[in-house]
């Protein structure tokens, strides 16, 4: 019997829908718990396993929405961790099933419906913990398939994102949000639920109140933005040019510019993001801008070095006459692979740089030699947690810490982002042990059997992890800016007239060497 015809599963799905209609949190929680337990009998049958987890995930999500009012408790955090586990495990199981199984058109329709639903709700979950760029990145991929709910939810995410944005992109983000929401309203009720449409319309109504607001006065329309990305079929090999670099940056959403979260078209002036106004003493007026300059420069340099290492296949003169032994396992050596590693290390170092910034900005009191991105969250009495309630951007940084260092309240490490945790593992091996990169072009012949000292990884996986690491750093940098802006607005909202603004001019490109 096909998994999508399983009567037991269909019956549980019906019960979950009925419990939601009745707003019965106890039944939703019981269904979620029961199906999570039942799913363990089907781990080898990937779609049955995913289907059980899908119903468990949606039931638990609905339970949280109905039952849990206080989002600053350990109980809420444990429930979110469990939801993340159910969603991520279901998505991974479906991805593996699609990779290993040939399916017919009917099965694809059923699978695609479940996959889109899980991914959409997963992105909504990321929004609830402050990881806006991550959520938008994943939701945008769904929206390019013209899935109506994803288009509408992407619109709400961009709307919320714009509310936090203090840069010149704010109005453009609102316009793109409007277009997405308006597009979602054109779908039939069977595709976009009437309740969802009402919610989308409420956002549109808010935007319609803005004076002189023309939502369709944008450089690109939503239809062109949601086309399949060009990078899928683009070959950058031996083509290291300014134009190609910025194409790569834009289409991987790596620019320090909030518009790049929705708009993947390459532009000039990509990296325009900087800190907002900060209240500080006149004798210390530029310190935070100075450290942010350093964070930003290191990010942009690491990003380019990664690109160059990935796409420059030319031999470099510095590799000539460097005698190496052929170990018969197809390793990769040379300046380009070392560029990728260097970019990886440099990007990873930004976590601690950001931790140093937060320690000084929030006056957490950690000694300079003890500060790290990990340690600023570890003290139970740490003042940084007092800021959480009114600063969702800071909460997004906290959840990145949880994924990176496998820190959970429930002690269930299966809820963490496996790719980010893998990023952490590879960095530690690269830094403290012995990482051997095997050539993905010869993956069938490559083997680690001949080298029991090495921890091996393919060049393709290292590149993929490198891009993901850069993207996570980008999100943290944006969240850092939002965190500061939210905090400055909270502490200054009643006393703005008492302060004098001091202008800081741009550091010219001509001065950079």
What do the predicted segments below correspond to?
Residues 63-83, 163-177, 319-327:
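Short coil/linker segments at helix-helix boundaries
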Residues 420-426, 444-513:
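Amphipathic, Lys/Arg-enriched alpha-helical patches that create a basic surface
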Residues 325-423, 432-433:
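Short non-catalytic regulatory patches outside canonical folded cores
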Residues 20-40, 73-101, 126-139, 171-181:
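Helix-turn-helix repeat elements of alpha-solenoid scaffolds
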Residues 4, 44, 75, 103-106, ...:
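Structural signature of alpha-solenoid helical repeat scaffolds
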């Amino acid at each position: 019997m096909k998994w999508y015809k399983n009567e037991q599963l269909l019956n549980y799905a019906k019960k979950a829908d009925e419990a939601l209609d009745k707003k019965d949190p106890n039944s939703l929680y019981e269904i979620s718990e029961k199906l999570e337990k039942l799913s363990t009998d089907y781990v080898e049958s990937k779609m049955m396993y995913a289907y059980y987890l899908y119903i468990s995930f949606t039931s638990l999500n609905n339970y949280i929405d109905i039952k849990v009012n206080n989002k600053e408790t350990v109980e809420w955090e444990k429930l979110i961790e469990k939801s993340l586990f159910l969603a991520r495990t279901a998505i991974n199981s479906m991805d593996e099933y699609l990779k290993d199984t040939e399916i017919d058109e009917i099965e694809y329709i059923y699978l695609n419906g479940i996959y889109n639903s899980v991914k959409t709700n997963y992105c909504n979950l990321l929004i609830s913990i402050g990881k806006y760029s991550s959520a938008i990145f994943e939701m945008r991929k769904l929206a390019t398939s013209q899935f109506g709910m994803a288009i509408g939810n992407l619109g709400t995410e961009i709307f919320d994102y714009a509310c936090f944005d203090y840069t010149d992109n704010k109005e453009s983000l609102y316009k793109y949000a409007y277009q997405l929401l308006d597009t979602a309203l054109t779908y039939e009720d069977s595709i976009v639920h009437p309740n969802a449409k009402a919610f989308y319309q409420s956002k549109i109504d808010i935007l319609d109140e803005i004076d002189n607001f023309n939502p369709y006065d944008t450089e690109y329309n939503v239809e062109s933005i949601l086309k399949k990305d060009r990078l899928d079929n683009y070959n950058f090999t031996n083509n290291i040019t300014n134009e190609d670099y910025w194409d790569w940056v834009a289409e991987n959403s790596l620019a320090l510019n909030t518009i790049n979260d929705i708009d993947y078209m390459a532009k000039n002036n990509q990296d325009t993001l900087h800190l907002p106004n900060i209240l500080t003493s006149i004798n210390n007026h530029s310190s935070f801008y100075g450290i942010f300059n350093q964070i930003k420069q290191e990010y942009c340099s690491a990003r380019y070095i990664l690109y160059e290492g990935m796409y420059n296949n030319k031999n470099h003169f510095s590799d000539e006459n460097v005698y190496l032994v052929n170990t018969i396992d197809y390793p990769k050596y040379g300046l380009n692979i070392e560029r990728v590693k260097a970019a990886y290390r440099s990007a990873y170092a930004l976590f601690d740089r950001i931790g140093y910034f937060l320690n000084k900005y929030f006056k957490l009191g950690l000694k300079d030699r003890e500060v790290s991105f990990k340690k600023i969250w570890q003290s139970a009495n740490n003042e940084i947690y007092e800021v959480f309630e009114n600063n969702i951007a800071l909460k997004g940084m906290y959840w990145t810490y949880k994924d990176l260092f496998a820190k959970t309240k429930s002690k269930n490490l299966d809820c963490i982002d496996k790719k980010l945790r893998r990023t952490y593992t590879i960095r530690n091996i690269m830094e403290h042990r012995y990482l051997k990169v095997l050539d993905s072009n010869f993956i069938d012949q490559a083997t680690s059997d001949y080298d029991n000292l090495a921890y091996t990884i393919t060049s393709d996986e290292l590149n993929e992890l490198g891009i993901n690491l850069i993207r996570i750093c980008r999100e943290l940098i944006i969240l850092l800016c939002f965190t500061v802006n939210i905090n400055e607005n909270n502490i200054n909202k009643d006393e703005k007239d008492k302060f004098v603004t001091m202008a800081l001019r741009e550091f010219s490109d001509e001065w950079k060497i």
